[in-house]
């Protein structure tokens, strides 16, 4: 360790070639140059290694040393991850700020986890207990929202020879001595894990319930299952980042991992400013108390975008192994793909479509396939899940480009953001005609069992109304709305109510930003009860223009923004006004 192992012979952007690297392994982490830049071996030919460097390589020259670490690129896992902001290679940015100032100096490093902070350790096992990989042997309170379970690392089993008593310890203290039969192994609260290797599980399970987000169009029409995968493609300005941040704020997961991969720094600044002030609707604590942020902004080295994605999913797997439900947001996977394209070009590989490497689809699949609901290792019947939501930024909003198309082959939910809806100030700008979810049957059953009957019928009817409205728009453009029969005019009124009072949601309103499932069902029930009464009124000769002027239409628009105290009076008022429609024929 620490000896000079190789010498740089060529530098091209983030890619470095070195010789004298005989005995090295693929994906081994190395220190490059006099400044000790962090790199990873990606090609080996004889004693020559091609290294992907995760820091700025300006000033690096042939002849400088390359030092092996004899370890794969890994992350540190243990108490202290929650509430911390890292860069793509798990350097804590607040520590780097204290050490080097606003700009990260080349070769800067700091321990990923605080070695000085003490945590109160609660043992969950005793001396003499037989334990195996994945078993919980202790617990520390990592934040007000998260109990951090100390687990037997994968690949180890044996008898506990010693376990620390309840008390205050730093994460490097020995808390367990495990007799494996071959040796007595000291365990601390820290584990290291290679970022490219998925952590093992006992069994992969099918999703059985939706991951509720509080966003009406998602929960009702295009639900994501707990342990599922989703993509949010959209052109610039269509609201990808706001949707991602909304999901990070309100999704009903235990842990949130937010990866800012190649996006603008001010978006991460927004997250840093907002999240500590926001309250988790489930616990009442700050949202930052259950969140890990990984910031690899557009002005940071290109190669580190890949590392940031793998770092994030590895941390997510670690918390999943504790039995938590984790939601991971990657904004944006397109920037990661662009980094792959640049490095592939530097390596002079044969390009695929639009210059992306031929292995683009397999790399994306490797990432998304680490999501899922799983049965965990260890004694007992524990399960956890990772739900992955990846933003895609197709140039010009072209969904036929390779990153979007390869992502769509993998994920089960597609939320297509539409620039036209965004320009109309309809947010979330998810196009209901282009989007889809393969988890709808699972979610529909859950809604009917836990929230209320008729949900599936109302959802299907909503989609039929919106699709029929789209067909009628062609006719309206040609001949105008005056020529339509009253039944079609009523359908247009229904679609308008659904679009403006239900699907449209204001992210910056205190109450409209999040709508729970019971309120969503209540809103749908009120709207469809009105639709039934309106159809009967139409049969008795009442015009759609008369229905359009009723006060209940305005009340629908206030449902989303109503506070909990205002909800009951508002819905009672809507019910009275809806019932009064049957008396309209007497006024004619």
Swiss-Prot record:
Main localization category: membrane
Origin superkingdom: Archaea
Membrane topology: Peripheral membrane protein
SUPFAM superfamilies for this protein: C-terminal domain of alpha and beta subunits of F1 ATP synthase, N-terminal domain of alpha and beta subunits of F1 ATP synthase, P-loop containing nucleoside triphosphate hydrolases
Keywords linked to the UniProt accession: ATP synthesis, ATP-binding, Cell membrane, Hydrogen ion transport, Ion transport, Membrane, Nucleotide-binding, Translocase, Transport
PROSITE patterns: ATPASE_ALPHA_BETA (PS00152)
Binding positions (ATP): 234-241
CDD domains xrefs: ATP-synt_V_A-type_alpha_C, ATP-synt_V_A-type_alpha_N, V_A-ATPase_A
Enzyme Commission code(s) on record: 7.1.2.2
UniProt-annotated location(s): Cell membrane
Catalytic reaction annotation: ATP + H2O + 4 H(+)(in) = ADP + phosphate + 5 H(+)(out)
GO biological process, one term: proton motive force-driven plasma membrane ATP synthesis
One GO MF term attached to the UniProt entry: ATP binding
Entry keyword ATP-binding: yes
Function in brief: Component of the A-type ATP synthase that produces ATP from ADP in the presence of a proton gradient across the membrane. The A chain is the catalytic subunit.
Family: Belongs to the ATPase alpha/beta chains family.
HAMAP family xref list: ATP_synth_A_arch
Oligomer and partners: Has multiple subunits with at least A(3), B(3), C, D, E, F, H, I and proteolipid K(x).
Protein's recorded name: A-type ATP synthase subunit A 3
Organism expressing this protein natively: Methanospirillum hungatei JF-1 (strain ATCC 27890 / DSM 864 / NBRC 100397 / JF-1)
Gene giving rise to this polypeptide: atpA3
């Amino acid at each position: 360790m620490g000896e000079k192992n190789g010498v740089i012979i060529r530098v091209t952007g983030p890619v470095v070639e070195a010789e004298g690297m005989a005995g090295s392994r693929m994906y081994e982490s190395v220190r490059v140059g006099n400044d000790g830049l962090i790199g990873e071996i990606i090609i080996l030919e004889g004693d020559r290694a091609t290294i992907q460097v995760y820091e700025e390589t300006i000033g690096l020259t042939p002849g400088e040393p390359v030092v092996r670490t004899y370890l794969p690129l890994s992350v540190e896992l243990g108490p202290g991850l929650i509430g911390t902001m890292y860069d793509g290679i798990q350097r804590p940015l607040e520590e780097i700020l204290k050490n080097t100032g606003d700009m990260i100096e080349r070769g800067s490093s700091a321990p990923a986890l605080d070695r000085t902070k003490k945590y109160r350790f609660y043992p969950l096992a005793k001396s003499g207990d037989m334990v195996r990989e994945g078993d919980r042997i202790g617990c520390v309170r990592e934040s007000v929202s998260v109990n951090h379970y100390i687990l037997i690392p994968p690949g180890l089993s044996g008898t506990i020879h010693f376990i620390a008593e309840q008390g205050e310890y730093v994460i490097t203290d020995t808390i367990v001595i495990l007799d494996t039969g071959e040796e007595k192994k000291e365990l601390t609260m820290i584990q290291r894990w290679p970022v490219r290797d998925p952590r093992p599980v006992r069994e992969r399970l099918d999703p059985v319930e939706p991951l509720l987000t509080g966003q009406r169009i998602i929960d009702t029409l295009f639900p994501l299952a707990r342990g599922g995968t989703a993509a949010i493609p959209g052109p610039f300005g269509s609201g990808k980042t706001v949707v991602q941040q909304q999901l990070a704020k309100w999704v009903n997961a235990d842990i949130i991992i937010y990866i800012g991969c190649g996006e603008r720094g001010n978006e991460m600044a927004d997250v840093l400013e907002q999240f500590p002030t926001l309250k988790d609707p489930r616990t009442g604590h700050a949202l930052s108390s259950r969140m890990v942020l990984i910031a690899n902004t557009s002005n940071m080295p290109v190669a580190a975008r890949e590392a940031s994605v793998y770092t994030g999913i590895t941390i997510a797997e670690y918390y999943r192994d504790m039995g938590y439900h984790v939601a991971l947001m990657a904004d944006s996977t397109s920037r990661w793909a662009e980094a792959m394209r640049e490095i592939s070009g530097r390596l002079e590989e044969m390009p695929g479509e639009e210059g992306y490497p031929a292995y683009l689809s397999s790399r994306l699949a490797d990432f998304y396939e680490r999501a899922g609901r799983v049965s965990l290792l260890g004694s007992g019947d524990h399960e956890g899940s990772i739900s992955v939501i990846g933003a895609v930024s197709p140039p010009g909003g072209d969904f036929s480009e390779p990153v979007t198309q390869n992502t769509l082959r993998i994920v089960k939910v597609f939320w297509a953001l539409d620039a036209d809806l965004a320009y109309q100030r309809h947010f979330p700008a998810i196009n209901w005609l282009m989007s889809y979810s393969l988890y709808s049957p699972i979610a529909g059953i859950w809604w009917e069992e836990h929230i209320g009957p008729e949900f599936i019928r109302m959802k299907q009817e909503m989609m039929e109304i919106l699709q029929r409205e789209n067909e009628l728009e062609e006719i309206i453009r040609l001949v105008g709305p005056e020529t339509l029969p009253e039944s079609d005019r009523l359908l247009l009124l229904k679609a308008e109510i659904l679009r403006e009072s239900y699907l449209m949601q204001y992210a910056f309103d205190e109450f409209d930003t999040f709508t729970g499932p019971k309120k969503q069902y209540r809103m749908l029930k009120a709207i469809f009860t009105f639709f039934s009464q309106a159809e009967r009124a139409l049969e008795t000769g009442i015009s759609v223009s008369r229905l359009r002027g009723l006060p209940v239409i305005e009340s629908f628009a206030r449902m989303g923004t109503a506070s909990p105290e205002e909800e009951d009076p508002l819905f009672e008022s809507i019910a009275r006004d809806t019932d009064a429609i049957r008396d309209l024929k007497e006024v004619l």
